[in-house]
């Protein structure tokens, strides 16, 4: 689940094949109008929803996956096949057809993963916590991964499942707060290096290179690379040499 890489295109092709195969089987069958939409909800949608906790497919791709189903089933339900999708996927209470929006269902599955497992203290919760703390060290900021601005610090994070969830939630203006330990500052007046770089308004490419240097040195704050009086950067940091710090987050 938390592996840095995923074969997303293969998964999209697999889901699209499920939808096309199901649509072809329905095309040749005889159905009553009032049976079509309940059939979609209870059969093909369940197959598509099965892996949604792990997929991070964007909304446009989900619409293309579901398109063969709607192209076949809407006419059978007495509805124009090109009926606006916003109405097709709207709930019955808002005079829609009530067909689940797969992108919304995917977000719901992700929120369930993020909220249910930590509350139940499952094994998956441990992996989530470890991954969040790894990202905390990687981005070097005082906020948890899901509370950061994606456009500012996404370039600093590895491409994991959590990063893709972060991007997805920000696209719909949602965030999830986790009670996870953050990076601590050992001195008064100290500051995290990444936040110093961001306050200096360096560009994204420079920020990425500075962060790589910070990760190589295994430091997080100004105090980690400065002299005891805080006035100068130690020679080892200039020369790219790691030092054994009295406190170590890595």
Across the structure, where does each feature detected by a protein language model lie?
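Extended C-terminal regions of large enzymes
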Residues: 65, 80-250
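Basic, alpha-helical interaction scaffolds
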Residues: 1-60, 64, 72, 76-80, ...
